[in-house]
Amino acid sequence: MADAPPTDEGWFVLHDCYTVDWDAWRDAPERDRTAALDDAASFLADREALADADEGESGVFSITGQKADLLFVHFRESLDELDRIQRAFEQTAFAEYTERAHSYVSVVEISGYTAPDYFEDPDSVDDGLRQYFESKLTPEIPDDTYVSFYPMSKRRQPEQNWYDLPIEERAEMMDVHGDLGKQYAGKVSQVIASSVGLDDMEWGVTLFADDLTDIKDIVYEMRFDEVSAKYGAFGDFFVGRRFPPADLPAFMAGERVPAPEGGADAHGEGERTHHHGDSDHHDGDDGEQHHHSTGDEADDGIRGELADEDIYAGQPHGEDVYATVLYSEAGADDLFEEVEGLRGNFEHYDTHVKTAVYDGHEADRRAVVSIWDTASAADTAAGFLADLPEVVERAGEESGFGTMGMFYETKPEHTAEFVEKFDTVAGVLADMDGHFDTDLMVNVENDDDMFIASQWRSQEDAMAFFRSDDFGDTVDWGRDVLADRPRHVFLA
């Protein structure tokens, strides 16, 4: 008998699909429809707020196509909780106008194919990687997102029997399969849940994305992979868009959901600000100018969310990458050890550009900078970075505006000269109105890689310096000593 890979299980999952009896709905008195909508919206909002649970996630989705009208997705710690939710919905007045079209029961799973060390030698797995795998078992549902759910199984035909293959061969194919999926990190988030012994097929796959074509693309590309092409068998696909329970009246009235806020275009066809979100890139100039942008709406969204975790985020001017930074009072060696574990996992993703620890030139603090190709990937990484030891509020928290000058990478022969120049500039800054604090942060792995962190009373005060002759002279001088052009980002 072939070996079975070990598995670990997390939350139980219920995908509950309903069709609406539109004839009965249209014929119902207005007061009955209003009462039914109020009842259902309250019920669904309570499920999303975990009014009757300690942990979990719930979401409401409109479904496009004839298979269903509504999809309710619930993650809970036990099957009993899902059973109670399903029966409780049937007690609502709204349920009189619906009929269950489909349901699917599963449990979130990770397997030894993708995480052998996690199972074989758990003590050797660093905390960052362990947190990553454990987060897979308790997934989040993005706020404003498209969804594609489908069940699948592995074939057991005489010439295509997945379960007869040696485990090493299966693991190798799954590794290639996983590498393909990683190309969509930051664009598509997935939840893999086992339904072996729980439902008709073997897994339930739930894909979330801001751009529905990203879901189409990942499924399309994976169809050509050997795991899917030879051994994959797929069930029906359910495709839709999440909307808040409060928009249920708009859904039943045939209006757009999610309902626009502040105008017809308030919700773009793929905008969201929740964790695991995505954002379009914008083009910059050639980097020679030194005016600065405070970022677009997506940038503002990620900054606002991460600020709650004492993580500061922004987009380097003229770049299509996103950066997050946090400050810690942990020792450099201890912090680096933690970050190195996280970085090992980050580097599995094509959207990862760089994660590094920087030590203060003057202040007794460290910074962790993580740079990604997409806002959503930076946002996701920040969730793990927030768990690093001794994360603190930024020094000079009384300021209303901060800057992080990134990638001042000097030519090795000019590094000492650059540090000396910084000390001179810091002296000028100390006398400037509205300036609170500035420090040079140096990469603990590369002395030539630095960024300057500043705190100002306001953006106007900071801009006064960046427009000054002193700064212009420094920029001119820097062209001769820097190995690459500097990147700047404002962090409000």
UniProtKB/Swiss-Prot annotation:
Compositional bias segments (type: Basic and acidic residues): 264-301
Annotated binding of heme, by residue: H177
Protein family (similarity comment): In the N-terminal section; belongs to the ChdC family.
UniProt entry tagged with the keyword Transmembrane helix: no
Residue ranges constituting the ABM domain according to the UniProt record: 402-490
InterPro entries per record: ABM_dom, ChdC/CLD, Dimeric_a/b-barrel
Coiled coil feature spans: none
Sorted UniProt keywords: Heme, Iron, Metal-binding
UniProt xrefs under Gene3D superfamilies: 3.30.70.100, Apc35880, domain 1
Protein name per the record: Putative heme-binding protein VNG_2021C
One MF annotation (Gene Ontology) recorded for this entry: heme binding
Pfam families the UniProt entry points to: ABM, Chlor_dismutase
Region of interest called Disordered, as start-end residue ranges on this chain: 253-301
